[in-house]
Amino acid sequence: SKTGSGISYTLTENFGLLPGESHSTVFYWGLGFEEVAAATSAKEMLRRGWDWEYQRTTGWLNQRISQMETPKLTEVYNTNLFFCIFYSTGLTLDTEELVCATSRSTRYYVSAAYWDRDVLLWAFPAILDADPQLAEEILHYVFGRQRRNLGIHSRYIDGTVLEPGFELDELMAPVIAL
């Protein structure tokens, strides 16, 4: 339904449970550049089913989990690792190109901007440890899309200048990452 502030959706299901019973409901929500791509991505998830999607996701995560000396250290390391992967990298909807971002939080004043220091000095080491192929893709992005403005304070994800001004740590972060 359309509201004054945009479009909203309500999804409901009615069911009854007897003692000891449980119930699951799965909603598939597709994303795409336009409505056909979004609908067919949801349809593909529906075709494969919840179990397949769950196994694929947990398999991907399990391949990247590191075991540390203690359970607590393992938990902290992997929580931070997956934060680094999921909040500093992503694929664009229009070109499916890998991009890196300093933050995806709407609370951060430069959400979805790119800073070499944040991505390469803070997130990259953990990503390199867990997923060398993704780390290589990040370096291609940095030395490709972001190359023309290395050393500039901050940039948009397409490489253009957001906040001008030279910063040595921004210039050296790609060198250190190599």
Tell where the protein language model's regions lie, with residue ranges.
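Acidic/polar, glycine-enriched structural segments that form the non-catalytic walls/loops
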Residues: 1-113
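Aromatic-rich carbohydrate-recognition surfaces in CAZymes
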Residues: 46, 110-178
